[in-house]
A protein has these predicted regions:
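Amphipathic alpha-helical segments enriched in hydrophobic/aromatic residues interleaved with Lys/Arg
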Residues: 4-8, 121-182, 198
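Short, Lys/Arg-enriched N-terminal segment that forms or immediately precedes the first helix
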Residues: 45, 177-184, 230-232
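Short helix-to-turn junction characteristic of helix-turn-helix DNA-binding domains
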Residues: 63, 200-203, 252
Length: 296
């Protein structure tokens, strides 16, 4: 995950050096009958005006780094690392970066008939085969899939993309049917918390208490906690923990470092706490995860 973010920051630095407007660059990394996957890097920022777009296919985009504001006919959401942007074919949408520059996503695109068949096979009624919400927070049920997609950006040939695309679609459809649309929040509070989330993403190895984050955002701890959970779908503690675990999962899958070193470098104070948290999040131990993600 750190390498994925670092590549985004380099792209943003190059855009600034060249004095060019932001742009979205998709790189298709896998495709099959009825589905495709792309590594999408966006270098837009507050200086770029958002514009209306349209989903030509059913879309599930996993945010891997950065963040943005997303609005569609299904609702709106602040997209942060680990969250899912959802779109049904034919929906109009708009992305904006009022609170910071750039994002990087792994986008899964599905042909409408293919996606509808997957949703039906998952047991979704006809009304639930189109997304009624704009986004999904970084939920534990999605963590293994989010981490596998991150690994795939670095090792494209090693990931069973079709299996991942099918599993992601089915799980997202089932989870999305139980998610409520987000209520509107005061813009000043939303902006402050959005900046705090970017701060967290850049300082995952630091001590990030609720009080400290609230002070830096200029909000009381209560209002910060309430606004953060409404925007991100999880508490600050859960967000930091899951971000650290995704980073650790990526390091375990792509490198050969010892588990204890991965734990410490990912911001955990001791390996026993790391092992418990990792197993709770991914359903297996760090070593078992490393073995299971060595697909070849």
């Amino acid at each position: 995950m750190a390498k994925i973010a670092a590549e985004l920051w380099r792209a943003l630095a190059q855009r600034q050096k060249d004095g060019l407007p932001g742009q979205t660059t998709p790189r298709v990394i896998a495709r099959g009958e009825g589905w495709s996957v792309a590594d999408v890097v966006c270098t837009c920022g507050p200086q770029d005006d958002p514009y209306e777009e349209r989903h030509n296919q059913d879309t599930i985009a996993i945010v891997q780094a950065g963040g943005f504001e997303y609005r569609s006919t299904a609702g709106r959401g602040l997209m942060t690392a680990g969250s899912l942007m959802l779109g049904s074919h034919g929906q109009s949408f708009e992305c904006a970066h009022r609170h910071g520059d750039g994002d990087r996503c792994v986008s899964f695109w599905y042909a409408p008939d293919y996606f509808e068949r997957l949703a039906a096979d998952a047991g979704a009624g006809r009304a639930d085969r189109r997304f009624k919400v704009a986004s999904m927070p970084a939920l534990r049920q999605l963590s293994p899939l989010v981490a596998q997609a991150a690994v795939g950006v670095r090792r494209v040939a090693d990931v069973p993309w079709e299996e991942l695309a099918v599993t992601l679609a089915v799980r997202t459809v089932n989870l999305a049917s139980g998610v409520s649309a987000r209520r509107g929040l005061p813009l000043h509070a939303e902006a402050r918390v959005a900046r705090a989330i970017r701060t967290i993403d850049h300082r995952l190895d630091a001590s990030l208490s609720l009080g400290r984050l609230a002070r830096e955002a200029g909000l009381s701890p209560y209002h910060f906690l309430r606004t953060f959970k409404s925007l991100a779908g999880v508490t600050p503690h859960q967000y930091v923990l899951r971000a650290r675990l995704r980073e650790a999962a990526s390091r375990l899958a792509t490198g050969g470092a010892k588990v204890v070193d991965v734990a410490l470098e990912s911001g955990f104070g001791d390996v026993s706490n790391f092992n418990r948290a990792f197993r709770a999040e991914f359903g297996e131990s760090p070593l078992a995860w490393r073995r299971s993600t060595r697909w070849t």
